[in-house]
Amino acid sequence: MSRYKLFIVDDSALIRLRLKTSLALWPEIQIVGEAENGQEALKKIPLVKPDVVTLDLEMPVLDGLSTLKELNKVYPVPVIMLSSLTTHGAKATIEALENGAVDFVPKDGDWNKVVSELKEKIKIAVLAKKRPKPFTGGTLNPKNVILGKNGRQLVVIGASTGGPPALREIIPKLPQTFPVPIVIIQHITRGFSKPLADQLARVSRLKVKEAEKDEQLLPGTVYVAPAGYTFKIDKQGGSLTAKIIEPVEYLPAHFYPSVDEAMLSAAEVTGSKTIGVLLTGMGKDGALGMKAIKERGGYTIAQDEETSVVYGMPKAAIDIGGVSRVLPLSAIAEEIAANI
């Protein structure tokens, strides 16, 4: 049995001890080193060559975000951030994801839940065929795109692992005159969807916000579905609206929000006037929704294997015939605009 070599970076000796004690119970993990700050980590990591690194965000000497940026240069390796649920912590976490971190785990709250989530994300990080690339920028050439020629009414984008940097590659490229609303379903921990929306808003010409219950979905606006809730597309009085529901019970194998639920509702409400986009991510969420949109005459786009951090969700949609076009990440914004 192959073991995942893990390196732990955290300024708290107690957290390092708890992580080592908890993860040592899992035979697939071999802890190959630890550091109490980023400076120490940058010296040790290239020597022990771990498969994955857990990196605390808030540390003295060299913080987690600065360490991540330096690590990208000296020893590129899948990194999982350990973050707090504070406003500052959430904002810094989103920035870390956009700078190459594969995923994150909030270390506040129930420790058993923290360890369980971390174990799962270590497996995903090791399986990830590549690390997310930092945002490269760029915009569409308006001369190459005629917006609105296909009469679409809605774009729904789904993503999981590797999603935040992928979204940052797509949304800022879209023009301010984009004629329909865009809904983003990103698998993310509750409390982190608004910072994701805020970060996208800072680099985009479109208005980007976290969606609110029953609000009208307006053209030229990007709505990030709030984490921890069921999100569906609805129609009230001829206008598209956000249907946001607090789950009565959280099912362990279900996502809140779910790409499938959002896309299936879009297939019902806007049908052939829908564009569905499925980006990098683990699992199969979104495959059924993409197929439903395509079967109703809508247009569906999946990110290709080469540019996906994890090629689970796009592949699942392709395998069941739910995809109109498979494209590299860099080409998706233009494809959306050309088919709107």
UniProtKB/Swiss-Prot annotation:
Q: CheB-type methylesterase domain: which residues?
A: 148-340
As for PTM, the annotation reads: Phosphorylated by CheA. Phosphorylation of the N-terminal regulatory domain activates the methylesterase activity.
Q: Which residues form the Response regulatory domain?
A: 5-122
Sites where 4-aspartylphosphate occurs are at: D56
Q: List the active-site residues.
A: S160, H187, D285
EC number of this enzyme: 3.1.1.61, 3.5.1.44
Question: Which SMART domains does UniProt cross-reference here?
Answer: REC (SM00448)
Where is the protein found, in the record's own terms? Cytoplasm
What GO molecular function terms would the record report? phosphorelay response regulator activity; protein-glutamate methylesterase activity; protein-glutamine glutaminase activity
Pfam families the UniProt entry points to: CheB_methylest (PF01339), Response_reg (PF00072)
Q: Which UniProt keywords apply?
A: Chemotaxis, Cytoplasm, Hydrolase, Phosphoprotein
Taking the first listed entry, what is the main subcellular location of this protein, grouped into a coarse class? cytoplasm
Q: Which domain of life is it from?
A: Bacteria
Q: Which NCBIfam families match?
A: PRK00742.1
Cited function = Involved in chemotaxis. Part of a chemotaxis signal transduction system that modulates chemotaxis in response to various stimuli. Catalyzes the demethylation of specific methylglutamate residues introduced into the chemoreceptors (methyl-accepting chemotaxis proteins or MCP) by CheR. Also mediates the irreversible deamidation of specific glutamine residues to glutamic acid.
Q: What is this protein called?
A: Protein-glutamate methylesterase/protein-glutamine glutaminase 1
